[in-house]
Amino acid sequence: MLDHFDLTIPAASSLAIVGQNGAGKTTLAKLLCRLYDPQSGGIEIDGVDLRELDLESWRARVTAVFQDFIRFELTLRDNVAPAGAPDDTVRAALESAGAANLANLDTVLARGYEGGTDLSGGQWQRIALARALCAVRLGAGLVLLDEPTAQLDVRGEAEIFERMLAETRRCTTILISHRFSTVRHADRICVLEHGRVIELGTHHELMAQGGRYRTMFDLQAKRFTAEEEEGATYDVLN
């Protein structure tokens, strides 16, 4: 739930959003997708209330990857470009997502079909990211990434998001992640707490402030070191 939420996102910039579970991160992403509309207040796109824009036209400008992304029992090509795209565009998106060699474009991504195959959770996540990158190549200008790489390790996620930010540098990109090694690369970072923005700035600015972001970043860095040494798994935001 968002409460007295006020945030301006410059076009063609990247914004990372962090905060504890229930802070309002996913709510914001779903509002921007117009999966539902705000009960009070509003969202403006270039000064126009989002609710006044044609829904179909708006969604054609947005691509989103959520943690519970869709897995189509279709060919690899149709998973990356459900609405269709040139093969060169599909292949370029797969390469940028680190999934260039997963399967032939005509391979069905499901067991039970002739020549079909299934993928691991991490491989499916790369397919979902390739779908977003393909949409960008086809004209989408707003990219929403809500914990889309939870099944990748820390280094794998950092590598993917460096590629994503490079590929979407002309887009407005919003990244939601628990991993600070990833969010630090965004142009700005927003810290949400109880539905409100409590800190906003670059990684270096927020570290210098010594506030909530600095506390969470330092704690996760220590726990990541412990995880490397002991094989344990920690989540600093829970």
What are these regions (language model features)?
Residues 32-33:
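Helix-to-loop junction immediately C-terminal to a conserved catalytic motif
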Residues 41-48, 58:
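Conserved ABC transporter NBD signature motif
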Residues 44, 98-127, 131-148, 152, ...:
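ABC-fold ATPase nucleotide-binding domain signature/coupling loops
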Residues 162, 170, 178-238:
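C-terminal portion of ABC ATPase nucleotide-binding domains
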